[in-house]
């Protein structure tokens, strides 16, 4: 799965994001797989390479990622979006306005998300 996180980081770098992988936050300890920063916005990405995640599993993943984003913006002075990147196309594309993006569509998501910011969950610092 580290290769999956690396690939996610490479795609972000190709789109001119500053990338940090495996960012550790403390109190409480949390790890963010990939952070992509561009201008005053950060994408906090949780990489999931599991197959066929059900809605309850995705709900829990999204809830935890939102908590990580809240912690991140309490430290960093910028807005951030939680994003879940998956290895496979999931039937669910959004939970609580958090995008569930298959890796094969990450590049086009990065091209388009700025225009869709008002429909995505953003947490301000």
Where are these regions (language model features)?
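Short glycine/proline-enriched coil/turn segments at helix->beta-strand junctions
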Residues: 17, 39-41
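Extended, folded domain segments that form the structural surfaces/walls around functional sites
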Residues: 9, 37, 55
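Surface-exposed interaction regions that form or flank ligand-binding interfaces
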Residues: 94-125
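Acidic-basic catalytic patches of nuclease active cores, encompassing PD-(D/E)XK
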Residues: 1-23
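Short acidic loop-to-beta-strand element that houses the catalytic metal-binding Asp/Glu
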Residues: 31-37
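Catalytic cores of nucleic-acid endonucleases
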Residues: 42, 47-104
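Acidic-residue sensor for enzyme active/binding pockets
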Residues: 5, 31, 46
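A short beta-turn/loop motif at secondary-structure boundaries
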Residues: 25-28
């Amino acid at each position: 799965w580290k290769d999956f996180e690396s690939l996610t980081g490479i795609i972000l770098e190709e789109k001119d994001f500053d990338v940090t992988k495996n960012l550790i936050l403390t109190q409480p300890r949390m790890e963010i797989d990939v952070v992509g920063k561009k201008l005053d916005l950060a994408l906090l990405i949780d990489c999931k390479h599991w197959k066929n995640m059900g809605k309850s599993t995705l709900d829990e993943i999204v809830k935890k990622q939102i908590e990580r984003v809240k912690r991140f913006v309490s430290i960093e002075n910028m807005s951030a979006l939680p994003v879940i990147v998956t290895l496979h196309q999931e039937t669910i594309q959004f939970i609580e306005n958090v995008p569930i993006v298959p890796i094969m569509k990450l590049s086009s998501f990065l091209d388009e998300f700025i225009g869709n910011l008002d429909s995505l969950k953003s947490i301000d610092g």
